[in-house]
């Protein structure tokens, strides 16, 4: 289950065979009714159940996996959803619809016998080497927020295609979506990657990327914007959206 800004992607697998791949679209009118992303939880959960019913898929699963949220930095891997994770995503300083993934998975799994809820490779996976954290100010350090799930899945597919193990390879992997992140993968760990949410790297369909520092400082002190408005701008209303009025590439 992958909740995104305007859609909820859902897939059903029997072993490794895909049974259903569906991108459930949410209109702007639908989402405008909800003041916060967490208010959208019943809408997205009900849409998933409705889709399964329409496709005639029995509501019987061994595991349900949701997209990981913006909690605390952790190593890559698969994590079982627990009460601490649910609390941390609900109270996270940065609210994003990815925080709903573990909640939807947990709610659906709770209705089933012997079904567990998990997340895998969330966006806050942090395996950066110490040198990669250094930036131009000793009062700051670089943080890791990136498309870990897609990058690592793509890297593993590539390794399988060439008959190698991901943990034996050195790779550069790029994710191109609403945000763009480019990671250095060294023997199964991503030791350097740009922060694709907070303004590092190339601008993208929705994100500002790296901006001229002095101009950004002047923008902050212009009195025209609040802190929250500027954070929303660099994280979702910049890039092609700001230039062209659309993120449709």
What are the residue ranges of the model-derived segments?
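Short beta-strand-loop/turn "lid" adjacent to the catalytic site in phosphate-handling enzymes
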Residues: 52-97, 124-135
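A mobile "lid/hinge" subdomain adjacent to the ATP/sugar-phosphate binding pocket shared
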Residues: 222-249
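Short glycine-rich, Thr/Ser-proximal phosphate-binding strand/loop in the N-terminal lobe
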Residues: 1-39
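General beta-strand structural signal in soluble alpha/beta enzymes
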Residues: 63-66, 116-122, 172-174, 192-194
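Glycine-rich phosphate-binding loop of actin/hexokinase-like ATP-binding domains
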Residues: 132-222
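Gly/Ser/Thr-rich active-site cleft segment
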Residues: 93-154
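A glycine- and small-aliphatic-rich helix-loop capping segment at beta-alpha/alpha-beta transitions
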Residues: 13-18, 77-88, 114, 133-138, ...
């Amino acid at each position: 289950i992958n909740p995104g800004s305007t859609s909820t992607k859902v897939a059903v697998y029997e072993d490794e065979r895909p049974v259903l791949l569906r991108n459930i679209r949410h209109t702007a009118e639908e989402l405008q009714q909800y003041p916060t992303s967490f208010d959208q939880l019943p809408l997205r959960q009900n849409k998933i159940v409705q889709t399964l019913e329409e496709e005639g898929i029995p509501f019987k699963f061994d595991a349900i996996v949701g997209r990981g949220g913006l909690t605390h930095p952790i190593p890559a891997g698969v994590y079982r959803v627990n009460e601490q994770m649910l609390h941390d995503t609900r109270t996270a300083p940065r609210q994003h619809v990815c925080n709903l993934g573990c909640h939807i998975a947990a709610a659906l799994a709770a209705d089933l016998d012997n079904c567990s809820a998990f997340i895998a490779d969330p966006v806050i996976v942090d395996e950066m080497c110490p040198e990669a954290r250094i930036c131009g100010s000793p009062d700051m350090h670089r943080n890791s927020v990136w498309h870990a799930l897609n990058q690592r899945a793509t890297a593993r597919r590539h390794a399988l295609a060439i008959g190698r193990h991901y943990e034996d390879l050195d790779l550069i992997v790029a994710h191109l979506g609403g945000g763009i992140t480019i990671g250095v993968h060294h023997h199964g760990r991503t030791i350097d990657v740009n922060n694709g949410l907070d303004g590092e790297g190339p601008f993208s369909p929705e994100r500002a990327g790296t901006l001229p520092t002095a101009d950004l400082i002047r923008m902050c002190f212009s009195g025209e914007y609040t802190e929250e408005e500027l954070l929303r701008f660099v994280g979702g209303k910049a890039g092609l959206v700001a230039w062209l009025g659309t993120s449709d590439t």
